[in-house]
């Protein structure tokens, strides 16, 4: 069982540990997700933990495996068998100097030291990424072209040739868009519109070279629109 908590700058002890809630005119203690995970022996997933403020330090004793004392109700909660804590972070708690992950913060070093191991997740291999896309799209050749395109862009990014990357998530967005419009050019274009014009054009030009069946130089035909009947 996994209990997932999406962390933001506003996340505090009340959100995590719990607090009193007004129920039918009375104040009633309500466990937060951390206590629920502790008592059920579940996996606690702290998602995007580097978005947190220093209020996240209320988890110190829990990360040490000692449980937590709920001072507001005078109860100590020990972790049930199987309880564990995982956290995800784009910056490993070091913040984002280049602004790519704006909103992330530098986390307390003592807090970070309480996580014994860190796993770095790189992009999937080409074969794995193809399998992911093939689950969502029947056009296997299109999936292969997309994966090759994304792989080239990432290599160019790491070499300093471009300032953005195409993530696996972005490729998934494209095949989902393709399932809607049945048009490769449109699916790719609407999914790279989020990038600045220069980067977008560079990505489209590169895909032109990867897939001979696609041409972004021409106009994409407009979608037929239903005729509206205006009442007289």
Protein language model regions, located:
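C-terminal regulatory/interaction module of P-loop NTP-utilizing enzymes
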Residues: 1-232
